[in-house]
């Protein structure tokens, strides 16, 4: 009976840890999804600003 209790306690403990890790990973994924649009905006700005600067310099330079 004592070994059964130890086994059950071990299974419960490992299951709790596994559930906790999965929950943390899921929360991290949700945070990543929330961050993506902002990161995309920054990437687009990085691509567009040099293009516009070059375009304006060509227009104003001529």
UniProtKB/Swiss-Prot annotation:
Is Transmembrane set as a keyword in this record? no
One Gene Ontology cellular component term attached to this UniProt record is: extracellular region
Q: Which family does it belong to?
A: Belongs to the frog skin active peptide (FSAP) family. Brevinin subfamily.
* Localisation: Secreted
- UniProt propeptide residues: 23-45, 61
Q: Which InterPro entries match?
A: Frog_antimicrobial_propeptide
What Pfam families does the annotation carry? FSAP_sig_propep
Q: Which residues carry this modification: Leucine amide?
A: 60
How would you summarize where this protein is expressed among tissues?
Expressed by the skin glands.
Q: What is this protein called?
A: Pelophylaxin-4
Q: Which region is the signal sequence? A: 1-22
Q: Which UniProt keywords apply?
A: Amidation, Amphibian defense peptide, Antimicrobial, Cleavage on pair of basic residues, Secreted, Signal
- What is the documented function of this protein? Antimicrobial peptide.
GO BP annotation list: defense response
């Amino acid at each position: 009976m004592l070994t059964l209790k130890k086994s059950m306690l071990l299974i419960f403990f490992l299951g709790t840890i596994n559930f906790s890790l999965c929950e943390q990973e899921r929360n991290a994924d949700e945070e990543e999804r929330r961050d993506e649009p902002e990161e995309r905006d920054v990437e687009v700005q990085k691509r567009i600003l040099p293009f516009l600067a070059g375009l304006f310099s060509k227009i104003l330079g001529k």
